[in-house]
């Protein structure tokens, strides 16, 4: 899936945070992906949900470097340990 909002270089202007939940594994156009990444490189934080982990397989590592991991497929479906590095941050405050 492609989203028209990402055609605008200023797509993230005015947002405090972006939640990525798109499922766009077949989108490979680097200018499009780079516009998404540029907003985050400029400081707009993001939360990336499940599908976003599998997106933008452009043949580069750009998306996966942004995520901090490379997801090439589903492994065993087991509980995932989560550690909150900033437990008082407003995004996660009160989470356990």
Show which residues each predicted segment covers.
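Structural motif
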Residues: 16-21
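A glycine-rich, often tryptophan-bearing local segment used as a flexible ligand/cofactor-contacting loop or short
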Residues: 25-95
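Aromatic-Pro/Gly-enriched surface loop or interdomain linker
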Residues: 1-15
């Amino acid at each position: 899936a492609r989203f028209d909002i990402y055609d605008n270089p200023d797509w993230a202007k005015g947002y405090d945070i972006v939640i990525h939940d798109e499922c766009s594994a077949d989108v490979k156009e680097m200018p499009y992906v780079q516009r998404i990444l540029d907003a985050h490189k400029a400081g707009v934080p993001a939360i990336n949900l499940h599908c976003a982990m599998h997106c933008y397989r452009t043949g580069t590592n750009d998306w996966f470097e942004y995520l901090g991991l490379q997801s090439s497929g589903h492994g065993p479906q087991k509980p995932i340990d989560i550690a909150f590095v900033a437990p008082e941050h407003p995004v996660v405050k009160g989470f356990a």
